[in-house]
Amino acid sequence: NSEVKTYLLDCPEGFTWEEGSHTHFALKGFNAGDKPNKSLVRHMSISTLPNENAIGITTRIREQCSEFKAILRNLEAGDEVALFKTHSNVPLKREDKNVYLLSSGVGLATFRPLVLEYFERADNVNQMHSLNIDSSKAFLFTDIFNTAPEKKFTAQFVDNRKDYYEEVEKLAADKDGIFYVVGSDEFLVDNIEVLRKQGIKP
């Protein structure tokens, strides 16, 4: 998908993170004035694991885009950016339950490291299921998000809301499952509503 880009940053010494982390990603000049220029800073998920030796940031850049993404689009290898306030908001929960990863579009990038972490060490996770909706049908990371019964991993991609929410309702039959949701605010609200109706509690 030509709109989706992954930027790989060299890892500064001693910089580490867990799967499911996000960071503040700042472009050059964000702190040049009296006050930080917030339009040059974005909250971004890290789409890699530390053992990949690079900090990956995956984002969708459309033709019409913000100042931030316009600058990002023109960055070249060797250009500098700043990262700060990095912390994990969705580490993989190991509670002997089934884990469901619900995402929209490029939100899937947040789950890439969780899946890799699960493949490396499946302790105390029964199985994992990913469901991603992308209306462009240009599905992401299909090398990793690929059903592998021997790893107890299933990956589903759908391109419309009807199929997506029907599938979520089916998954919600597992009242004991752990559900992760990543996408726009509207996507989160809709998913939480569907899950609650099915009796899944936060």
Predicted regions and their residues:
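Ferredoxin-reductase
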Residues: 1-77, 134
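FNR/FR-type flavoprotein reductase catalytic core
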Residues: 58, 64-202
